[in-house]
Amino acid sequence: KYNSFGEHNNEMLKEFLNKFKFKFIFKSSTENYKEGIFNNSLMRVLEKYEDVMNIILPTLREERRKTYCPFLPICPKTGKVLEIPLIEMDKKTGKIIFDNNGDKIEASILNGNCKLQWKVDWAMRWFTFDVDFEMYGKDLTESAILSNKICKTLGKNPPNGFAYELFLDEKGEKISKSKGNGISIEQWLRYASPESLSLYMYPNPKRAKKLYAEVVPKTVDEYLTSVEKFQSQKEKDQILNPVWHVHSGKPPSEKVVMPFSMLLNLVGSSNADNKEILWKFINRFHQDMKPKDYPILDSLTEYAINYFKDKVEPNKKFKKPSSIEK
């Protein structure tokens, strides 16, 4: 389906951005290298080679310092990125010579023949595109400090940075794919709307958040409460309501008939496995309600069934009846 793992990741990123209706211009680093978009910036890095090395080398172990080079040539035979020491350079032509196990390799740094080590690459992208704001995980804070220095060395101000905390599981431990603790963004979007996830992310952006299954129903109910509350608020208070920000100033108007937690109980007690059956039970309490008139509730019926099937039903334990109960 994809030509490379990188292309797969790019498509996943675009899919995520589209789900949340981000306006974006996608730029492939590989294509930018090959098309020469980075050429001027690469020549600038070569021009400032000694200054860049003075920033990076003190952060490396002694053994690594002997072989480190910010430029990584692409092997003409295999197409693989080579991490080998630099012997010579020509700052005017952009040609550099590397030592590949005793063999000298001459390479141009232009048009995709070389890539940069990532901390230098990060700064080079900021320099190229005049990036003025960059978000990154807390674990990249030290790298961002180095890239800021390199960007200044190249001749431009680095972007304003925003370091965010990483997600934790219900025990307060880091989420790990190998452990399978916590839930993924994809799972959240199976159990609840993108807007509920936006609401979850909205408060305290610099604080570590616990991300596990039980958080979803609670957040959905908070979202429903905020949507309903918005309609009766004065304008100055509406702006303080998180759904104003989640919906870019235009939150939906829908009366909340039942919270998500109640809907989950209804799924469990009715044993409904599709939203049509669930709506029949809803109509027992609210006869005149129709799915088309309550789009939020209608979407919640599907989310509730998915959540119940995945997170509640597998953990249900039934008591064995006693002889009297039989």
Positions of PLM-derived features:
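Catalytic adenosine-cofactor/nucleotide-binding cores of aminoacyl-tRNA synthetases and other
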Residues: D139, E165-E313, K317
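Active-site cores that bind ATP or allylic diphosphates and position pyrophosphate for catalysis
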Residues: N18, F22-I185
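Alpha-helix capping and helix-coil boundary motifs
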Residues: S4, E50, L60-E63, W118, ...
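Internal, well-ordered alpha/beta segment that forms a basic, Gly-enriched binding/recognition surface
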Residues: K1-F16, F22-S29, L189
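Hydrophobic alpha-helix feature that most strongly marks membrane-spanning transmembrane helices
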Residues: K1, K152-G155, M201-Y202
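Short, intrinsically disordered, charge-balanced linker/junction segments flanking boundaries
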Residues: K317-K326
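A structural signal for well-ordered alpha-helical segments within the folded catalytic domains
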Residues: E7, E11, G36, T141, ...
